[in-house]
Amino acid sequence: MSAYTAPSQIAQRQLDYFNGKHVLVAGEVEDLFPLELAEHCESVSVFTSNYSYFRQIRGHSTITSYFGSQLEADSQADLLLLYWPKAKAEAEYLLAMLLAKLGSGCEIVVVGENRSGVKSIEKMFQAYGTVNKYDSARRCSFYWGQCNTQPNAFNQADWFRHYSINIHGQQLEIQSLPGVFSHGEFDLGSQLLLETLPSLSGKVLDFGCGAGVIGAFMAKRNPTIELEMCDINAYALASSEATLAANGLQGRVFASDIYSDTADDYRFIISNPPFHSGLDTNYNAAETLLGQAPQHLNNQGELIIVANSFLKYPPIIEQAFSNCATLNKTNKFSIYHANK
């Protein structure tokens, strides 16, 4: 069984495309194929918005790795290897941002699972040049093309979606980049959580902050709290920072792979935990969030989360805290609470 994802396996079949190239890898890359690629190329650099993946690859000396919502560094790459992301809007964003950096003449290879909508590259790339499919395997597709026009300059501010919410009389302006959970809209789970939250005090962590809706609401309604907001996704961090700024609010926003970079003395941990990874359902992060929460709360600490009611979170919370209460419930979502 291969250690590589299916998109990497189809790229591995076509190594001749990469020989002698300076390759920039971006998108939904999840494995260590870039290390093998480095053996066939002049250079390999990886741009990722996923902090967990960045932590996995940043220690390897044969590649250069970057984490962020946009690539700030200069690049000598002449070939972009794009792993198709789950959100079409994120693919558009990555193409606009990275091709503006690499310029006309840059080659592109796109790999992705067919169910992810990778076929969309055929139409999406027309603004830059031509791209064609050259291989199919493992329910994936391999495209090659070349940018033959000078891409427009990239301005991240143009890519934010803006929307307003009003809960309990609190009016908030939300800023959201492509690739962020519930991009450009207010999800019903978070709404139920905000309607249920008690008054807060002390040091509060918004875990998996997304576009910053929960953190901004908590800061506006409880102006004396010490707010921290973390996420694994760089687009979420940039969105949360923009949301706080748009509402004149203060908070520390930082990257964390679950609890990798968090404190251990929170009065409250508040979350709408993620349970999707790429195209698949993945409970690992949420289970670690819940199971290890007591280690990151102070002696009076409390955990409050919203979750789809079908998810079996109460037993995990009960095991970690020896208590779990349901504060609110609809036919789709539940609000769970636990005391340390």
Curated annotation (Swiss-Prot):
| Family (UniProt) | Belongs to the methyltransferase superfamily. RsmC family.
User: What PANTHER family does the entry give?
Assistant: RIBOSOMAL RNA SMALL SUBUNIT METHYLTRANSFERASE C
Instruction: List the protein's name.
Output: Ribosomal RNA small subunit methyltransferase C
Subunit-structure text: Monomer.
Swiss-Prot/TrEMBL catalytic activity? guanosine(1207) in 16S rRNA + S-adenosyl-L-methionine = N(2)-methylguanosine(1207) in 16S rRNA + S-adenosyl-L-homocysteine + H(+)
The leader peptide range reads none
Pfam families, per the entry: MTS (PF05175), MTS_N (PF08468)
List the GO cellular component terms: cytoplasm
- Name the EC number(s): 2.1.1.172
Where, subcellularly, is it found? Cytoplasm
The main place the protein resides is cytoplasm
What does the UniProt keyword field contain?
Cytoplasm, Methyltransferase, rRNA processing, S-adenosyl-L-methionine, Transferase
- Report the enzyme's class at the first EC level: transferase
- Role this protein plays: Specifically methylates the guanine in position 1207 of 16S rRNA in the 30S particle.
SS bond list: none
- Which gene is transcribed and translated to give this protein? rsmC
Q: Which GO terms describe its molecular function?
A: 16S rRNA (guanine(1207)-N(2))-methyltransferase activity; nucleic acid binding
Family annotation (InterPro entries): DNA_methylase_N6_adenine_CS (IPR002052), Mtase_sm_N (IPR013675), rRNA_ssu_MeTfrase_C (IPR023543), RsmC/RlmG (IPR046977), SAM-dependent_MTases_sf (IPR029063), Small_mtfrase_dom (IPR007848)
Q: Which organism is it from?
A: Vibrio vulnificus (strain YJ016)
